[in-house]
């Protein structure tokens, strides 16, 4: 009898838990649906207001600023702007300047909010290039304050907003600030990719070269990576840095530049370091071997064939890849393809097939 009561009790508890879970799931889905419809309604309302020129109606303007104190409403507004930008680019360009100046009024409010909410405001400024139209004396102090924030989201979005301002001196000031506070410096890729969104590249890069020696090596590497993707016009400066720098990471960044833009003056350095097997410097050797893929010649062929048998897997792989990219005749590679080094043979065959497949696919 007791056992039956215990089983019945557990059965009732289990049914209760199942019913509770079903009820909460229904409520959750209902709330999600209601919120989604509300957001869509707000989005359409904001889109219409933007097209009617928000700033012409002062009463409407004040109401919107108050609504945008809510981060969710701010992001809904950004979604509406995104739709206008994609569907009606001309109307967007006509109205974004006045809206950008309106958004300045949110800065004192968001300065008192959490880091994530501050980052959201900077994000909206960045994606619509609002900082181009805003008063620098109002928006820049806010962005530079975010730049010193411990939150990566704040720093990244502040940088993006500064890049979108198209103000070269503000960008240089931001880079100098990050260099002076190295613990705040974001990952090299974040910094380089962000700088690529800055439109005035050919005006910015000379200023970077002018101050390059004043930056820390880590910052220099990020800037050299940026220059590699941004312009082919700096071979002399890159060559000088390649030959004079003693920092391996900086040398690797320069080597990658010459792997992207051919310059025969870099070949002696590439050949020397591709062959040099110094302990702790295999990354530089690896970068040189990879760069040699665009410098055909008997010395290149000889070194690559030698390094395909390297003890280092990365060096071996890049040597095989460079040989394949050079479109070397298979007869010239017969000593490897028919040799006793099974690992070198398999690696080379794999890379030859991969390059052939890429060419077949038009890549």
Language-model segments: what does each one mean?
Residues 23-113:
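N-terminal topogenic membrane-targeting module
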Residues 47, 61, 74, 235, ...:
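Short amphipathic alpha-helical segments that mediate assembly, nucleic-acid/protein binding
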Residues 79, 87-97, 119-132, 156-166, ...:
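Structural detector for internal amphipathic alpha-helices that build alpha-solenoid repeat scaffolds
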Residues 105-130, 134-142, 151-160:
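Structured extramembrane domains adjacent to transmembrane segments
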Residues 1-39:
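N-terminal signal-anchor transmembrane alpha helix of single-pass membrane proteins
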Residues 113-115, 150-152, 182-185, 215-216, ...:
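Short inter-helical turns and helix N-cap capping residues of alpha-solenoid HEAT/ARM repeat scaffolds
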Residues 1-6, 275, 349-363:
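Short, Lys/Arg-enriched, disordered terminal segments
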Residues 61-65, 97-111, 133-146, 168-179, ...:
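Amphipathic alpha-helical scaffolding segments comprising HEAT/armadillo-like alpha-solenoid repeats
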């Amino acid at each position: 009898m007791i056992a039956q009561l215990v089983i019945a009790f557990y059965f009732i508890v289990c049914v209760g838990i199942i019913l509770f879970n079903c009820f909460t799931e229904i409520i959750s889905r209902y709330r999600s649906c209601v919120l989604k419809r509300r957001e869509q309604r707000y989005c359409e309302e904001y889109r219409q207001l933007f097209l009617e020129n928000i700033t012409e109606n002062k009463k409407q303007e004040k109401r919107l600023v108050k609504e945008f104190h809510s981060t969710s409403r701010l992001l809904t507004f950004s979604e509406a702007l995104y739709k206008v930008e994609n569907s009606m680019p001309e109307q967007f360009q006509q109205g974004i300047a006045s809206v950008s100046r309106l958004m300045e009024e949110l800065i004192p409010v968001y300065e008192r909010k959490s880091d994530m909410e501050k980052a959201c405001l900077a994000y909206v400024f960045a994606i619509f290039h609002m900082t181009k139209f805003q008063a620098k004396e109002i928006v820049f102090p806010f962005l530079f304050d975010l730049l010193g924030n411990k939150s990566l989201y704040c720093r990244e979005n502040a940088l993006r907003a500064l890049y979108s301002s198209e103000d070269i001196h503000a960008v240089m000031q931001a880079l100098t600030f990050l260099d002076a506070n190295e613990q705040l410096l974001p990952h090299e890729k974040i910094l380089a990719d962000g700088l690529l969104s800055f439109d005035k590249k050919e005006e910015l890069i000379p200023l970077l070269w002018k101050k390059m020696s004043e930056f820390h090596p880590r910052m220099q590497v990020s800037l050299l990576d940026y220059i590699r993707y941004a312009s082919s016009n700096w071979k002399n400066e890159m060559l000088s840095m390649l030959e004079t720098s003693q920092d391996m990471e900086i040398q690797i960044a320069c080597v990658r530049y010459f792997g992207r833009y051919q310059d025969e003056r870099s070949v002696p350095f590439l050949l020397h370091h591709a062959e040099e097997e110094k302990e702790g410097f295999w990354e530089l050797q690896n970068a040189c071997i990879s760069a040699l893929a665009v410098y055909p010649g008997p010395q290149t062929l000889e070194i690559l064939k030698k390094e395909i048998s390297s003890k280092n897997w990365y060096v071996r792989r890049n040597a095989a890849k460079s040989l394949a990219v050079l479109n070397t005749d298979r007869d010239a590679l017969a000593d490897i393809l028919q040799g006793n080094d099974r690992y070198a043979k398999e690696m080379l065959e794999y890379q030859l097939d991969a390059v052939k497949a890429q060419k077949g696919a038009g890549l």
